[in-house]
Amino acid sequence: MSYIPFPDISPELFSIELFGVTFALRWYALAYIAGLLIGWRLVLRMIRAERLWSFGPPMTEDQLERLLTWVILGVILGGRLGFVLFYQPAHYLAHPLDILKVWEGGMSFHGGFLGVMTALVAFCLKERISILPVADLLAAATPPGLFLGRIANFINAELWGRPTTLPWGVAFPGEAAQSCPGIEGICARHPSQIYEAGLEGILLFAVLSLLVWRRGWLHWPGSVSGMFLAGYGATRFLVEFVRQPDAQFVSAGNPLGLAWQISGYGLTMGQILSLPMILLGLYLILRSRRTA
């Protein structure tokens, strides 16, 4: 069976030791930082492009600077709490201090999304500015960060896919990745992180950029946010078919790791969380067109 060996890339860019304590900069942390900075620059560019707006941009550059702090808190707190509540509530209920161990991994996109939305609504109410136009700005600027995050997932050899015999399957390192019932020897898996990087990162960014800069969708508040939600939800729903489910959902009687099922058919947790995003996204698109 042909497969692609996992590249020899350290998850750490570099590490230094100060006063007996080792500090390391990981690719994952760099992806978060770079994603936020790129997103900020993209939003700033859209704010400055007056032709994109019917009645001017929804906020000033100074307000954008303040919003960035709120977004950072929403991403970190929401992403962590989402993982705790959606994927391993029993573990963290028994070991509450483990919630603080973010360096051990465990972030949820859906939780981060809810955290950012909560921060966005609170910020807009405080600043007395319209919510949907600001949400459109953030939606159009989010995919580059998603792309970088998925590449970091690949480098960390985490969130890999289900076993496959396809020639582009990757032999991820580690006992968990190589534990494939019924497969002898090297176990190759779908590089689902790369699939997601291409779909929710590159493809979604291309679509949203076209709608913003060529089709003028920022003139219809909520339309860009709706396309982001529907696009991300749909791509995540599809990738879940080849993505390895979280270990806590997998058992001898549930080898596919379905979080909800009837007669052997069902949905993974990622698919369950993505369906409301798709429905809300379609609603926002239709609403924006009816009120245009």
From Swiss-Prot:
Q: Does the keyword Membrane apply?
A: yes
**What EC number(s) are associated with this protein in UniProt?**
2.5.1.145
Give the record's keywords alphabetically: Cell inner membrane, Cell membrane, Membrane, Transferase, Transmembrane, Transmembrane helix
Which pathway is it part of? Protein modification; lipoprotein biosynthesis (diacylglyceryl transfer)
Name any Gene Ontology BP term.
Answer: lipoprotein biosynthetic process
What is the protein's membrane topology class? Multi-pass membrane protein
Question: Where is it predominantly found?
Answer: membrane
Cystine bridges: which residues?
A: none
One example of the protein's molecular function in GO is: phosphatidylglycerol-prolipoprotein diacylglyceryl transferase activity
Its cellular-component GO annotations read: plasma membrane
Q: Where in the cell is it found?
A: Cell inner membrane
Which residues make up the binding site for a 1,2-diacyl-sn-glycero-3-phospho-(1'-sn-glycerol)?
Answer: 150
Q: Membrane-spanning residues where?
A: 18-38, 67-87, 105-125, 193-213, 222-242, 266-286
Record-linked Pfam families: LGT
HAMAP family of this UniProt entry? Answer: Lgt
Give the PANTHER family listed for this entry.
PHOSPHATIDYLGLYCEROL--PROLIPOPROTEIN DIACYLGLYCERYL TRANSFERASE, PROLIPOPROTEIN DIACYLGLYCERYL TRANSFERASE
Q: Which family does it belong to?
A: Belongs to the Lgt family.
Record's function text: Catalyzes the transfer of the diacylglyceryl group from phosphatidylglycerol to the sulfhydryl group of the N-terminal cysteine of a prolipoprotein, the first step in the formation of mature lipoproteins.
Query: In its UniProt entry, what is this protein called?
Result: Phosphatidylglycerol--prolipoprotein diacylglyceryl transferase
Q: What is the source species?
A: Cereibacter sphaeroides (strain ATCC 17029 / ATH 2.4.9) (Rhodobacter sphaeroides)
